[in-house]
Amino acid sequence: IHGQTIGFRSFLKTTTYSKLTFEYHHMEEFRRGGDLLNRPPHEANVAEQTEHSINGGGLKYDYFSPNEKHSFNVFASAQHINRDSYYGGGQDLNAYGNTTDLNWMAGSQYVYSFGKCIFMPSDLTAGIEFNQDKLEDNMWGYHRTVDQKVNIGSAFLQNEWKNDHWGFLLGGRLDKHNLIDHIIFSPRANLRFNPTQNINLRLSYSSGFRAPQAFDEDLHVENVGGNVAMVELAKDLKEERSQSLSASADIYHRFGAFQINFLVEGFYTKLSDVFALTDGEVKDGILTRTRYNA
C-alpha cells in the first residue's frame, strides 16, 4: 500500500459577521493483496488490487447577525473518484475493472435563537439539502456494468429548548429518494437533565432509513472467489428502517488535581424490512442475485 494526499482549506472574512470558506483535496492510493506481489495481478494465483484517484472540494458561506439571534449558511461540495481494480484468481485476465463515482451536494441551514419560546430559551434550526451520486462500475471481461444514479432531496426542522438543568429537543427530517416512491419521515427527540453541574442524564430517540442500491462492494469480493455476480432490486423493495432508543448517565468528580468520569450507557435498535440477497441464478455465466426485504 502506498498513497499521497495534498489539499488546502482557507477562509475569507467578507464582513465583520460573515465569512467564505473553501477547501480542496486530492488523493492517490495504491493497494495490492494476494500472492506474487512483484508480478502483475493476472499472473498471481489470487489478487486484489485497487488504484484510486480522488478529487474533492467544497464552498461554504456563513452569516451571523449582530444581535447573535440569527445565523445562516449555504454550502456546496463535490467529489470525484476514479478507481482501476483487479479482483480475481487463477490468473484470470477478465478480472480487471474500473469504477467512477461523482457525488455532489448543496444545501442551506438557518438557526434562530429565542430568548424564550413558550417556557424557556431555545434554538430553532431549519434546513434543506440535495444530494446526487452517479456511479458506474465496469468489468468488461465479464460484460458486467452497473450504472446507478441516486438523487435525494431533504428538509429538516428541529427546536431545542435548553437551560442549565434541562434540555428538550424535538425534530424531524423529510427525505425523497428517487428509488423510493414516497417521502420518508424520520423523527428524533432528546431529553437531558442536569441535577448538578457534574451529573448529566440523557434519553434519546431517533429513526433512520437505508435506501435500496444495486451496487455493493461485496460484488468485487465474490470475484476473487471465482464468482461473477450482479445484484437486481426486487420490484416491491422498500427502504430499510431503524428505530433507536438510548439512555446514558455521565458523572464527573474531582479529587484535588485529578478528575474522574463515570459513564453508563445503553441502547436498543430495531430494524425493519432488512435487506437480504437471494442465492441467485446463473445467467450467461453471471450469478444474478436479487435484493429483497427479509
Q: How would you name each of these model-derived features?
A:
Residues 71-85, 194, 202, 236-293:
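Membrane-embedded beta-barrel scaffold of Gram-negative outer-membrane proteins
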Residues 12-14, 62-65, 100-102, 110-116, ...:
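Residue-level signature of outer-membrane beta-barrel architecture
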Residues 16-19, 65-71, 113-123, 164-165, ...:
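Short loop/turn motifs that connect adjacent beta-strands in outer-membrane beta-barrel proteins
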Residues 20-22, 70-76, 106, 122-128, ...:
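Transmembrane beta-strands of outer-membrane beta-barrel proteins
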Residues 39-48, 60, 87-98, 137-147, ...:
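Extracellular loop and loop/strand-boundary signature of outer-membrane beta-barrel proteins
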Residues 1, 27, 32-33, 71-88, ...:
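Surface-exposed extracellular loop regions of Gram-negative outer-membrane beta-barrel proteins
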Residues 26-30, 63-65, 78-82, 112, ...:
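Transmembrane beta-strands of outer-membrane beta-barrel pores
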Residues 3-5, 13-72, 78-103:
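Flexible loop and strand-edge segments within Gram-negative outer membrane beta-barrel domains
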